[in-house]
Amino acid sequence: MKKIFAVYYERDVNELGQLYPKIEDRQFNEVLFDIRDTLAKKNIDFVLITRQNPYVGNGEFFGYWQPGDNFCYKKVDELIKPDLIHDKGHIDFSDGFLNFFNSHDFARLGRNKYTQAVLAEGFIPRTCLVCSEKGYDKVLKNIKSEQIVAKPLDLNGGNGVTLYNRNNLNENQSFPIIMQEFVETSGGIDGMVNGRHDIRLYIIDGEAVMCSIRQPKEGGWLSNTHQGGTIHFYNKSEINPELLKFAQPVIEKFDQFGGKFYSIDFMRGNDGWYMIEMNDRPGMPAFFQDTNGAVKEFHEKLAAMITKELA
């Protein structure tokens, strides 16, 4: 009997069977079909489960979405019991019968940037937790950079991230937030990238298997693709060895919380490497973004890990 691998999203499939109907979201549509095709070679079924499919207990959901033609899904109204779930929506229910890619402890860690900063102290820019305007005095005392980055604790994709001058911190900020030292990355990385950047390492079973280099649009500082940044992918042999050495103890810190697949973002400042943050449910590249075989190799390693987890 075939094993079932499911990806769960906290969003709806529309009446046309589309999960991501916008053209600019092509990556998020196609990557799921790429995963389906890769897993099919290993005799594993892929299904999509969304918040439209209620959990009924004992590891079962009522209804699921079967990949169809033209990157659309067909609704199936029957019970399904996935053998393994990749949670892209932060499922907050479990009766002990659901088997997740990453543990719940790891998912909670992914939702709290301050907890990540405490765990990665010494690897991450100087960080302060700010719960009210009274916390600004602590920020100015501990962070010396002229510019200061403010981030919500639980958002990704550059959403809610703001850059302030230290003399003009926003009194209308929503709390709690973290505030961090701003690290200038315009010096780039020899042999890899010129100018401002961040580098994302994709971690599978404790190993950095691929990286992406993202750069902001001209004049910008946020490199997230939804913020107008560009992205290119590289296989492990192309990753800067200094970064791999710097990243290894960081990976070990996060692995102890039960992460099987995740990403960590890094940057190189004028005085060395820094971790930015960990993402417990990173966006995955689709085959159409592959220019050098790195994405195909990533999918094969991901499928191998899924196969091992289902054995």
Where are these regions (language model features)?
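Extreme N-terminal starter segment of soluble prokaryotic enzymes
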Residues: 1-6
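Short glycine-rich His-centered loop
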Residues: 7-24
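Conserved N-proximal alpha/beta basic substrate-recognition cap immediately N-terminal to
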Residues: 23-131
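Active-site nucleotide/adenylate-binding loops and adjacent lid/helix of ATP-dependent enzymes
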Residues: 91-97, 102-192, 244
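Protein kinase-like catalytic core scaffold
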Residues: 148, 209-210, 274-277
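Phosphate-binding site of ATP-dependent enzymes
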Residues: 157-238
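Short, surface-exposed charged micro-motifs
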Residues: 200-201, 263-265
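C-terminal active-site "lid" helix and adjoining low-complexity regulatory extension at the edge
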Residues: 241, 255-261, 268-311
